[in-house]
């Protein structure tokens, strides 16, 4: 039995090492990460997260009592609240009805709520009144719907994030009070995840809203039950969101030389980008739309706007890609004798994932009945999309199977109201509660989480420095 267990751990560690390597998508990245990956493999071997998960998930009546309370809240009230929010979708930054329902529920359970944090009208922070100091446990909620062509809709099941997170927060807060145990619970209401600008979590992070948290958790819909490998990464590449705002001068189109055409400048921008693509590494993604292009065909457009997401697997080379696009905009303005304003409005960056949280959370999801289990860990990525919070504070995003449909579809919205969605939400709520219980009650576990997170954060810094040395810019001589 012992031999089989050791072999299993070695196989798991090898899988984690290989999966971590997949986070580096280009040859340059893989070479820069070579030494870092060796150090990470040594770290993961010393932590032995699978053995840690086996120990923590063993029978524990106190934990199961707290988990049962979270399930009771879901069954009696919070699944119905999830359905209500699903049926009344609100897009980002105008989620007034949704946050009122969530905040009212938190107030009824002894949370003190402050709304409008970080200067965002529908962002809020709810702190449990009887805070007993560290450890400080954070729970992130989202509640915005997607923008559809005919209506807003909860095709990413953000409608369930609030109820799931609240069930865990209330259950663990009540336990800490009942047992007079140390610890505080804070719920963060984060608007507009599907929209930027602004990037809500980054704005809140920069305003200090998340300061003092030891661990943060959240849930999210998924077509399968999974967890990330340890390391750093993001789901959708590193992103710079940039608007290029061109101004010209109006004139009658029959005498267009009397004006300066801002729309032509935008068209030149797209042409310029296409002309320099061969100078940019092929993994880059430069995706833009024209959001303003003039009001009438008989008037020279004096204002035009292009909105771009500029993506690359790492943020170091992303800066070179961004310079190509910025210079393409400046060249377009120069060629058309217009002016351009470059407005950088948002970023998404690599976050950090740790096996000490991921393996334990994954074990709990399976324990509480998760379906469609993905055996191997996925690529490393932060527990939230911006990287601002998840590169500074350890955490985990729970993702039990809650839909048979693809994300961002009407079918996923329908699943939020059905058996598959409700089952997945119950699994997430129970697993999240169990993990928070372990973090609150096991100082040695908190120390292991911190050790892993701090080490990976240091390795991430070393990796970025290696990339800076690798990504040289050719020297161009004077003509």
Predicted regions and their residues:
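Boundary at the C-terminal end of the N-terminal hydrophobic targeting segment
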Residues: 21-25
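Acidic/His- and Gly-rich active-site-bordering loop/insert found
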Residues: 26-184
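Divalent metal-coordination and catalytic microenvironments
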Residues: 85, 106, 126, 139, ...
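Histidine/acidic-residue-rich, glycine-tolerant segments that coordinate divalent metal ions
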Residues: 146-160, 175, 179-301, 408
């Amino acid at each position: 039995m012992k031999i089989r267990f050791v072999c299993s751990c070695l196989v798991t560690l090898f899988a984690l090492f290989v999966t971590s390597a997949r986070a580096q998508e280009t040859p340059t990245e893989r070479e820069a990460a070579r030494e870092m990956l060796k150090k990470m493999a040594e770290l993961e071997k010393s932590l032995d997260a699978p053995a840690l998960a086996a120990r923590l998930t063993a029978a524990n009546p106190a934990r199961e009592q707290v988990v049962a309370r979270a399930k009771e809240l879901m069954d009696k009230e919070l699944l119905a609240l999830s359905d209500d929010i699903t049926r009344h979708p609100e897009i980002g930054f105008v989620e007034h009805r949704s946050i009122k329902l969530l905040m009212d529920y938190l107030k009824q359970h002894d949370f003190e709520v402050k709304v409008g944090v970080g200067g965002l009208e529908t962002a809020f922070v709810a702190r449990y009144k009887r805070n007993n100091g560290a450890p400080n446990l954070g729970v992130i909620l989202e509640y915005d719907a997607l923008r559809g062509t005919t209506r807003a809709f909860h095709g990413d099941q953000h409608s369930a994030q609030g109820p799931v997170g609240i069930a865990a927060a209330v259950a663990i807060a009540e336990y800490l009070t009942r047992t007079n145990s140390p610890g505080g619970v804070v719920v963060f209401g984060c608007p507009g995840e599907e929209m930027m600008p602004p990037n809500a979590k980054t704005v809140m992070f920069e305003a200090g809203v998340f300061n003092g948290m030891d661990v943060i958790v959240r849930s999210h819909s998924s077509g399968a039950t999974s967890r990330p490998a340890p390391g750093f990464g993001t789901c959708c590449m590193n992103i710079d969101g940039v608007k290029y705002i061109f101004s010209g001068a109006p004139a009658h189109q029959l005498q267009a030389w009397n004006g300066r055409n801002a729309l032509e400048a935008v068209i030149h921008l797209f042409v310029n980008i296409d002309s320099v693509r061969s100078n940019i590494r092929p993994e880059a993604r430069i995706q833009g739309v024209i959001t303003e292009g003039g009001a009438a065909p008989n008037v020279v457009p004096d204002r035009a706007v292009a909105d771009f997401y500029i993506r690359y697997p790492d943020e170091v080379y992303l800066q070179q890609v961004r310079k190509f696009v910025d210079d393409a905009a400046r060249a377009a303005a120069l060629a058309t004798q217009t002016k351009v304003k470059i407005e950088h409005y948002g970023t998404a960056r690599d976050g950090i994932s740790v096996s000490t949280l991921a393996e334990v959370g994954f074990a709990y999801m399976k324990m509480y009945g998760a379906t469609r289990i993905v055996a191997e860990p996925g690529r490393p990525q932060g527990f939230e999309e911006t990287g601002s919070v998840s590169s500074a504070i350890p955490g985990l995003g729970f993702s039990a199977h809650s839909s048979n449909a693809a994300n961002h579809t009407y079918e996923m919205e329908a699943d939020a109201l059905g058996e598959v969605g409700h089952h997945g939400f119950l699994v997430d709520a129970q697993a999240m509660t169990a993990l928070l219980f372990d973090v609150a009650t096991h100082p040695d576990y908190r120390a292991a989480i911190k050790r892993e997170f701090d080490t990976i954060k240091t390795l991430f810094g070393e990796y970025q420095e290696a990339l800076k040395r690798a990504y040289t810019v050719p020297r161009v001589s004077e003509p």
